Design a protein with these regions (language model features):
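Bacterial N-terminal signal peptides
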Residues: 6-15
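Boundary/entry segment of secreted carbohydrate-active catalytic domains
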Residues: 21-51
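Substrate-binding cleft and catalytic face of glycoside hydrolase catalytic domains
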Residues: 40-209, 213-234
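Conserved, mostly hydrophobic/aromatic
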Residues: 75, 130, 145, 171, ...
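Aromatic-lined carbohydrate-recognition surfaces of secreted/lumenal glycan-active proteins
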Residues: 141-145, 168-197, 244, 250, ...
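Aromatic/acidic polysaccharide-binding cleft in carbohydrate-active enzymes
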Residues: 265-338, 345-351
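Carbohydrate-binding surface patches
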Residues: 347-385, 410
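C-terminal beta-strand-rich structural cap/linker in extracellular carbohydrate-active enzymes
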Residues: 397-416
Length: 416
């Protein structure tokens, strides 16, 4: 990333944002390993390795914070030195479960299980140890604690909503002893998560939650699902368009005890090998960021997360040499379009998405266009003569001639 972009982003992070404006903390980034820190800008570090087995995996009462400490150290810090990280719990250690039928062995020799602990005191002791460790002295305070990863996914949880409420109820008063900490609901995936989150909140989970978390994957990948996946706004998404996910979980929160409390996308993207063409990846990630930013104010979406940085299969925006892909570079550029402004919800006019960022700034793209093998289609698009220049997602700036731009699937920022 350029030194100018990095300096600008750091300045905004420290300065904060006025009410209603998109803060830099809105842009969350997952990280695969701490030895490969993101070379893109981000304001919140989201979704490190699930923490219970990582910290207390070997034996009851034996804690090793080394792995999670590395993520906390990597996270941006606010003016109070609080680590802006979503620390996620999940997978019960094997020693805490007598029935091992839901358990599996990890490469490091520990055992993880999807069942709840037999004795909730083990959970209480673990949460207490974590909060005591991240106390601002031995280690930085942590901003967000997510109770469990994907409680609606049997790969992570095979207990009931009521059992998850019990874990949240036990953890909440301990975590809230830290005045800087916020408790995030267990995350859910679409579509099973709609009902599961509703049951969790109606069962009392709303009493022990400061924010509602969901994972924003518009389309499924793997298991024979078609690729490339549709664009994140597409009605052909095999899960749901990202806008539908946001408004749905906003409604679930508001009608089940969390009226006006923030919601967060703690993980999301095109998924495992969902998009392979570099130009379409750049278009996809920028649509994803812009659409969510447009709904931030009206839905109290506090932050959203791209999963993930790292040379891995899911949402890959890093090259084999450790640099940002064209999608990663485009992500950086679009952050400069959005941070510090108050975007309105994007609207669709024919094939054209129109996203008003601020007075004199508008983002547009044409959903009917595409890219393949280094070539992208465009169509002439007439703009108001008030707009005199544009910027593309590579950062290239140019004057608008005769009130017309060549518009494709990649967004353009129009500027008066």
């Amino acid at each position: 990333m350029s030194k100018i972009l990095s300096f600008w982003f750091t300045f905004l992070l420290l300065a904060g944002a006025a009410q209603g404006q998109i803060p830099t903390t809105f842009f969350g980034m997952g990280v695969a390993v701490t030895t490969d820190p993101p070379k893109v800008n981000y304001g919140t570090l989201s979704h490190p390795a699930v923490a219970w087995t990582s910290i207390e995996g070997t034996a009851r009462g034996t804690y090793s914070f080394k792995a999670i400490d590395a993520f906390v150290k990597l996270a941006p810090k606010d003016a109070n030195g609080v680590a802006l990280i979503d620390l996620v719990f999940g997978w019960t250690p094997g020693w805490a479960v007598a029935d091992q039928t839901t358990c599996f062995h990890n490469k490091n020799g520990t055992v993880s299980c999807t069942a709840p602990p037999d004795n909730i005191q083990d959970w209480v002791d673990f949460i207490t140890a974590v909060v005591n460790h991240y106390n601002g002295v031995t280690a930085p305070h942590v901003k967000y604690y997510e109770i469990w990863n994907e409680m609606s996914n049997t790969k992570f949880w095979t207990g009931t909503p009521a059992q998850m409420v019990a874990l949240a109820q036990a953890a909440y008063p301990i975590i809230k002893q830290d005045p800087y900490a916020l408790v995030v609901t267990p995350s859910v995936v679409w579509k099973s998560g709609v009902n599961y989150m509703t049951e969790f909140l109606q069962g009392g989970g709303y009493l022990y939650s400061d924010l509602l978390s969901f994972h924003g994957y518009p389309s499924q990948t793997g298991g024979g699902q078609p690729v490339p996946v549709p664009m994140p706004e597409s009605p052909l998404s095999t899960n749901a368009p990202i806008m539908t996910m946001i408004t749905t979980f906003r409604g679930i929160a508001d009608t089940n005890g969390m009226l006006n409390k923030p919601i967060v996308t703690t993980e999301g993207g095109w998924g495992t090998n969902g998009v392979s063409d570099p130009d379409m990846q750049a278009a996809w990630i920028t649509h994803y960021e812009i659409l969510q930013a447009g709904l931030a104010a009206t839905n109290n979406l506090q932050f959203q997360t791209w999963y993930t940085w790292g040379y891995v299969q899911s949402g890959t925006i890093e090259t084999s040499t450790g640099d940002p892909t064209p999608a990663g570079l485009a992500y950086n550029v679009v952050l400069t379009w959005l941070a510090g402004f108050t975007p309105s919800p994007c609207t669709l006019s024919g094939n054209i998405y129109i996203c008003q960022v601020a007075f004199g700034k508008q983002i547009v793209w044409d959903t009917s266009q595409t890219c393949s093998d280094g070539a992208c289609t465009t169509e002439p698009y007439s703009v108001s003569t008030a707009y005199t220049k544009y910027e593309d997602i590579t950062g290239l700036k140019a004057p608008i001639k005769s009130g017309v731009v060549n518009l494709g699937i990649k967004p353009l920022l129009l500027v008066k």
